[in-house]
Amino acid sequence: MNKMTVKDIKDWKGKRVLVRCDFNVPMKDGVITDENRIIGALPTIKYLMEHGAKVILCSHMGKPHSILSDEVKLTKKDQKKIDALPEAEREAAKQAVIEKAKKEDPKKLTLEPVAKRLNELLGDKVTFAHDVVGPDAQAKVAACKEGECVLLENLRFHWEEEKKDLEFCKKLAAYCDIYVNDAFGTAHRSHASTAAIVEYGLVKTAVCGFLIEKELTVMADSLEHPNHPFVAILGGAKVADKLGVINNLLEKCDTLIIGGGMAYTFLKAEGGSVGTSLVDDEKIDYCKEMMQKAKDMGKELLLPIDTVITKDFPDPIDAPIETSVVASKEIPADMMGLDIGPKTRELFANKIKSAKTVIWNGPMGVFENPILAAGTIAVAQALADAQGATTIVGGGDSAAACAQLGFADKVTHISTGGGASLELFEGKVLPGIACLNDKN
């Protein structure tokens, strides 16, 4: 990794440091339900405080901007549920989500609970600012002493954050002498606080924190210098979300395993009958192209050989349902595939266990439903059983599945960034990384 890190700066004492964190943690009734992202940010924050910096923390939380601006954007979770519905039902479901979102109070996405938790973890050295660039933030930043922290309010309470507004960037830049990005989860976003404040030349010294350093070291090195056999596993709902990832990983891996909803487009491309399973008909030709590419390169591309099917998508998502198992290319016309079957679980697991490098992004089925979680559990277990292998879980739903199923401590690395991991797997340059200073 050729980017400067916090350890490359020799004198932090008295320096004002703006640290972009990812505190977008799940909340229920104002209570944090998973604090892993907060814990992940602590090494950088503690290092800066211990070295006498005046630390200004900033982050987003959810998508309040869409409600405040009256342009509601679907969350990934909502989009996933809608995509799994029959096409005729999707528009009505989308409108129902939008109407519900418009009635919500965006202020429930305040970062104040995060500030309280940080205070508990850092010994009452964190002050919460009730705005981002307003008078409260300005006063608290000005009063911040060496070895103390100020956490700004949710950046996305300002539309200017995502629009890279120059004046907003200037106000953020006025808080600091040095910028630190430690939010890998948003490193693929080119927003005011993730990249533009440096791109506009407003802050000259910009380095990465320990969290981003770890992400880049583990994931980038495994992609560029993998031990073989190298097995990549892709799941999730849509082929369209992973076009570039499929293509790039085929160049690097020995075996590419395709599961989840995206597998049915590949199966249909092979002439299979997939019933009402999720299919992206516009990507059929692309799937054929990728299968031919794998064949031409001598790479192995594995698809499910059997599938767990049901008549309707569970509603709610964890509702009890009746299922059966059929060959993956013989799904009845009125049925849909929602998980990989037992023969596929064994096939995939054996391939994973024999690997020396494994990268996984995307669940094998609707793991939120216990009846449809067996495929995802089998993959997680296989990663845990892959002796001597480097095993990497690429954030998002895969990371959630690992945590939910109890495998988080049994793999080499779980990324903190879903979208950022995907773009790294795709070989893209991440704006939040590219803007940082290179090492001499």
Predicted feature locations:
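Active-site loop-to-helix "anion-binding N-cap" substructures in soluble metabolic enzymes
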Residues: 1-440
